[in-house]
Amino acid sequence: MSDNHEFIIPVGNPVKKFPSGLQELYLDVCENGQPPICHQRLTENNLEWLIRKIHKRKTLGASLSCPDRNEDYFEIEVNPSWIAFEYVVNNGMEDEAFYSSFNLAYLDSDEESNTGTIYGSFMQLRYTMQDPKLAAKCVEYFARTGELYPGAA
């Protein structure tokens, strides 16, 4: 019997003004045709660069993680057809959990995307979203607070 549970967290109030400053996080990025960024300390400049890439729907996979990479982390996959993010909490522990974007149109479906991720795998459409501005807000809010953006479900 599986202990996996899925439930939807309702949308909270969108944050009008994000806090300033960044959490101590490190950035890893794989982008088509570009050299990878490996465990680079997150700065305002590389956060702004990542947000621009998300807005333009550039095909990439990015991760924001703690310095030792063994704790909580936030990942985003972007391609022209869809965007998906995942926030993993208590990585590797008994109470590990993950939170992800979702697409209401595919919530009860196992259908996969017809375009792969930057890593070559396919994404279940239930875990995707279409709004690059909202996806960028989710990334920026996590980078500044270490928490999920309350304006997204």
Label every PLM stretch briefly.
Residues M1-H55, E77-V78, A84-A153:
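Acidic, proline/glycine-rich low-complexity IDRs
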Residues K58-S63:
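Short, hydrophobic/aromatic-rich segments at coil-to-beta transitions
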Residues C66-I83:
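Short, structured protein-protein interaction patches enriched in aromatics and acidic/basic residues
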